[in-house]
Amino acid sequence: MVLTKAAISENLFEKLQLTKKESKEFVEFFFEEVRKSLEKGEAVKLSGFGNFQIKKKKARPGRNPRTGEIFLITARRVVTFKAGQKLKNKINNYLIKKNNNF
């Protein structure tokens, strides 16, 4: 199972009694704010969930595994996510409970 923006929007519609349009706009606005911050190189810290950050990767040599051709992988920025301790604990507690039910 995969959680999608549409599913998040539907949950907001059902649980917070927003209109479908409002719930969709809320989800879009949230992700747009996260994207804008990351584009500027700012970290996004969501208390109780985790942190998104931009890491700079230096240019480095790479190799095509099929042809063996050496080429330069250009410098770039990548998004990383580090789960917060509360999220890690909830996931681990869920897995422990799930495994004990077998």
Swiss-Prot record:
Keyword Hydrolase: no
Pfam families: Bac_DNA_binding
Gene3D superfamilies: IHF-like DNA-binding proteins
Cited InterPro entries: Hist_DNA-bd, Histone-like_DNA-bd_CS, IHF-like_DNA-bd_dom_sf, IHF_alpha
One of the record's GO molecular function terms: DNA binding
Keywords associated with the record: DNA recombination, DNA-binding, Transcription, Transcription regulation, Translation regulation
One BP term from GO: positive regulation of metabolic process
SUPFAM superfamilies documented for this protein: IHF-like DNA-binding proteins
Function summary: This protein is one of the two subunits of integration host factor, a specific DNA-binding protein that functions in genetic recombination as well as in transcriptional and translational control.
HAMAP family in UniProt: IHF_alpha
Similarity section: Belongs to the bacterial histone-like protein family.
Name recorded for this polypeptide: Integration host factor subunit alpha
Organism (species): Buchnera aphidicola subsp. Acyrthosiphon pisum (strain APS)
Lineage of the species this protein comes from: Bacteria, Pseudomonadati, Pseudomonadota, Gammaproteobacteria, Enterobacterales
